[in-house]
Amino acid sequence: MWRLKIADGGSDPYIYSTNNFVGRQTWEFDPQAGSPQERAEVEEARRNFYDNRYQVKPSGDLLWRMQFLKEKNFKQTIPPVKVEDGEEITYEKSTAALRRAVHFYSALQASDGHWPAENAGPLFFLPPLVMCMYITGHLNTVFPAEHQKEILRYIYYHQNEDGGWGLHIEGHSTMFCTALSYICMRILGEGPDGGQDNACARARKWILDHGGVTHMPSWGKTWLSILGIFEWIGSNPMPPEFWILPSFLPMHPAKMWCYCRMVYMPMSYLYGKRFVGPITPLILQLREELYTQPYHQVNWKKVRHLCAKEDIYYPHPLIQDLLWDSLYIFTEPLLTRWPFNKLVREKALQVTMKHIHYEDENSRYITIGCVEKVLCMLACWVEDPNGDYFKKHIARIPDYIWVAEDGIKMQSFGSQEWDTGFAIQALLASNLTDEIGPTLARGHDFIKKSQVKDNPSGDFESMHRHISKGSWTFSDQDHGWQVSDCTAEGLKCCLLFSIMPPEIVGEKMEPEQLYDSVNVLLSLQSKNGGLAAWEPAGAQEWLELLNSTEFFADIVIEHEYIECTASAMQTLVLFKKLYPGHRKKEIENFIKNAAQFLQVIQMPDGSWYGNWGVCFTYGTWFALGGLAAVGKTYNNCLAVRRAVDFLLRAQRDNGGWGESYLSCPKKEYVPLEGNKSNLVHTAWAMMGLIHAGQAERDPTPLHRAAKLIINSQLEDGDFPQQEITGVFMKNCMLHYAAYKNIYPLWALAEYRKHVPLPLGKNLNQVVNCIGQSLYKKYK
């Protein structure tokens, strides 16, 4: 059976940590583990997922949950509650539902204080890792038989009915992910017509029916060129000379969004080397299987700009194609010939590799994310197949692997800190501290130990890095990359804990560490009042015209985000109350400008576009929280009134809210089909309305929403898995498996705290008894 291990560094001599691996989560397969009953439960979970895979596409993340609940011998002892039609929700019933959710989720806390969870969903994460291991000869070492079995399961279970795979698990089929998945199946031993339910034959038919892999988007062409199934001359140039451009140029790497920079850094190295993996018999077979014409007859120069229509979200503007053409026709022929190949290209490759090593070292070889991880790892192998750099990369592969009932997938890079910050706030909102003191103390300890203690090493500004000391990352301290909203939420948790009894929640964080966090937040605000996520924004907007990906938008430069801005506003308002003397004027200006930013970018319908969650419901919850923190109310702020109107219009007949992921790419509100509701969306909308004072005006919409959440709760206190709720770069969805627990729990907590409710029969009896006793005593 598969087992999740927590904060375990293992015995690999090539792995190291800044905080003894706090937050690390790795999976291992133990063939001896598990009773026959436990194994049967796992198989049943797999079968249930497969049978319902077209109805609910994200996993319920059940394997580790089964493990943890078994290890802790958890039994739900609080009876379930239901609210009948026409029945009023009482304080007693809301408390029972809340306590059930709190006790269940507390039992899922890991030993180091964080809450594990899947953070995956894109279907282009895993295949490149398999390809990299195949190229380097480490496939069977890194992925033994059980791993390969589960990788194949994941591919089979997420194949669309038309035979293809989407950009993400809920998406329509694309050439990019269909070709990658097909190649992955073939590498893992399936024949051209093999796989569960004829997976390979159906996939190949889809590929050929849509023009073959000459219609791959640019990232796909890059990976196929690396693998030897495509020719580099069929790709647009990615010159490593980019890394030696003068800093005054507008397209200098320092001005790029960090993820864009980190992807094209190793890509440009591999392109500059024109690296191609070993041409094995399998590669020769794939050349025959994936094209609509013989491989040797492909006109590579003419396929550079081809892309399947299913893959295009951001069509290349003409000016971009002209730029690639000029580089292709004039620049590359010069840079690949003497003397420029020695004078310029070799130097550019050396500088690029220097940046790769710097980023690897400063992230303990986790790198900034999974796409970059595989490319940097391969670049290190190309530089030296037997070198320590590559071995250190191999040691960190387990940090990206996640196992659930739908198989093995590759994580974005883990959401440990992000999920835990919200989980703690939800639990604190429940006002059940007396029942969950040890849970809160462990969570507090994890948050404190996960704060980044140092800036990147050396002259980090020359390596295009920003300060990170005092920040929190999305995942764990070893990752090292500061994120503004993760920092805001981590800091908020520490501030909330600082006003609680230390004998219950542990000692509060030192003020200097809090000040470091504030410094990071202040450094990331733009002139327009908005907050960037990773590094200061400010590059010229026209650079987005150079976005060479076809399936993402807004990836070239850093931008300001509603969620980051609102998170920081709420946190700095609280910080200002507790530490009124620290950078008072700067914080006041930050808050004032941030509030102005939120009001300026509100959509015409009263909503806010969510950049990291689906979509307008998510953004509106954050924005209303930020505005409420600075004293904006329904009565004194037009933006709040418009937002409330938007949310009330979107409420469904059953009392919930349900927004399709299509809202994100379309940038307009799209409800779920069939009048469906989603509990996570319902929770976000509820909390947004509570921020806006809905309880005082008309609590009826809140009662209707709370009824849906209470009646949807499962027997053990869990909530059902529904549609995917996370997103990045407008067009790709991300499955946050923890959200189904955190947000319904949190919404119930806020509902119980802010909405006046009748006590209920049993509580009324208790109150009457107490009243009678006091009356007799003092009469």
Curated annotation (Swiss-Prot):
Please, which domain of life does this record's source organism belong to? Eukaryota
Identify the keywords attached in UniProt to this record, alphabetized.
Answer: Isomerase, Repeat
**Biological processes per GO annotation:** pentacyclic triterpenoid biosynthetic process
User: What PROSITE patterns does this protein's entry cite?
Assistant: TERPENE_SYNTHASES
Which residues does the entry assign to the active site, renumbered to this chain? D485
| Any Pfam family hit | SQHop_cyclase_C
- Write out the ranges of the repeats annotated as PFTB: 148-189, 514-556, 640-681
| Sequence similarity | Belongs to the terpene cyclase/mutase family.
Protein name, per record = Beta-amyrin synthase
Q: Which organism is it from?
A: Betula platyphylla
